[in-house]
Amino acid sequence: MEKMRFPESEELPEGVKEIEVKDTFGYCTELYPDVEYAEHSGKKLHLQIMTPLVYGQDLKWPLIVYVQGSSWHKQKLFQSLPTLVRMCERGYAVAIVEHRESELAPFPAQVIDTKAAIRFLRMNGAHYGIDASKVALWGDSSGAHTALMAGITGDAEYLPEKYPQTTTEVDCIIDWFGPTDLVAASQYPSAIDHDSADSPSGVLIGGKALHDYPEDAYPAHPVVHLRRNRKTPPILIMHGGSDPLVPFNQSCILYEALKRMDKEVEFVKFKNAGHGWGGFMSETALDIVEKFITVDR
């Protein structure tokens, strides 16, 4: 978009400080809060939709669907807002997905909800200035697990009932330090419990200890849903080397599985970074994400 230029004023009253600043262009942001997209047993689920704001032009923006991590519990939906607003400034629409918490609805409810949100946005996105033909699915931590599950399974399984004629498939997935093998997570050093019935993973599979019920955890592993003969969206993995909550090995498991099946994947390790800190909020991190999203495939 070209910016409108006006003549420079020659006025400079005494005492006024005049400086030159580097011209960096970014869009303002418009928020559509609490857009209802689904309801389950009386619980309404919402999207927080943000789009770049341009007056006087009917523009459509490529879409980022974001799943906020929460250990699959009730989400703090605006936790990643500073990062996501900066993506709006770069020219993307962003929709933050509220999903059912695992205490109320175990796996695969979160995956089904995310796919319902994608379908809703494809059907109704034009109202919000969204180009729903270009969809990137992004999540952090447990949200990345949900994004991986939704993106990898696509239209094959875990489908919502509404808008059955509308695809849930996405163009790419951004996985920020997501769990990929729930059972294996307990085999590596971590600051939290990954195995007991009341651990985040245990609650996700219905309040069961993973070592007692590995067969119930198995379907919640993104890697087991990879198929050589089924299209997998390109995946960008980003993980901190010193993550205290989701072991770095979790991303290695996914990366190696994708490479074995000749799937498109990029893996970036943030040296000495933790669980979402140590560089993930930097412009460098967002540059990596944007470059991956905009690749002409």
Positions of predicted regions on the chain:
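Alpha/beta-hydrolase superfamily serine-hydrolase fold, recognizing
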Residues: M1-R297
